[in-house]
C-alpha cells in the first residue's frame, strides 16, 4: 500500500458541501492523499464550526484532482467499497497517531 499524505499544503483550505436539502456547510481540509492501490485521490474533512472541546466527525471522499492536484475545484465521490473504506480509515488512524503528521 502506498499513500502520500499532504497535511501541510492543505492548511487553511475550506470546502462547502451541500446536502440533499440544499443546506450548505463549511468544512476544513484535514489532509489529502493518493492511493496507488486504488488509483484515486482522497480528501478528509471536518466541520469548520467546531470548537477544540467538541468531538469531531471526519468525513472522507475520493476526488478527481485537477491538473494541479487541487481538490477545491473538483467533484467529491462517496466511498462505497468496504476495502477502500478500511484503507482510508487506516490512513486516518496513522495520521491521528503520528504527532509529526497531525501537528500535535
Swiss-Prot record:
InterPro entries: EF_Hand_1_Ca_BS, UPF0473
Coiled coil: none
Residue intervals passing through the bilayer: none
Domain of life assignment: Bacteria
UniProt similarity note: Belongs to the UPF0473 family.
NCBIfam families xrefs: PRK13678.1-4
Protein name: UPF0473 protein LJ_0477
Provenance organism: Lactobacillus johnsonii (strain CNCM I-12250 / La1 / NCC 533)
Amino acid at each position: 500500500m502506498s499513500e502520500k499524505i499532504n497535511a501541510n499544503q492543505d492548511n487553511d483550505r475550506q470546502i462547502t458541501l451541500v446536502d440533499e436539502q440544499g443546506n450548505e456547510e463549511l468544512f476544513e481540509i484535514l489532509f489529502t492523499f493518493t492511493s496507488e492501490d486504488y488509483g484515486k485521490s482522497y480528501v478528509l474533512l471536518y466541520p469548520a464550526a467546531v470548537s477544540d472541546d467538541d468531538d469531531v466527525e471526519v468525513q472522507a471522499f475520493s476526488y478527481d484532482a485537477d491538473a494541479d492536484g487541487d481538490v477545491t475545484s473538483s467533484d467529491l465521490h462517496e466511498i462505497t467499497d468496504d476495502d477502500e473504506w478500511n484503507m482510508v480509515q487506516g490512513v486516518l488512524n496513522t495520521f491521528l497517531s503520528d504527532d509529526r503528521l497531525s501537528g500535535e
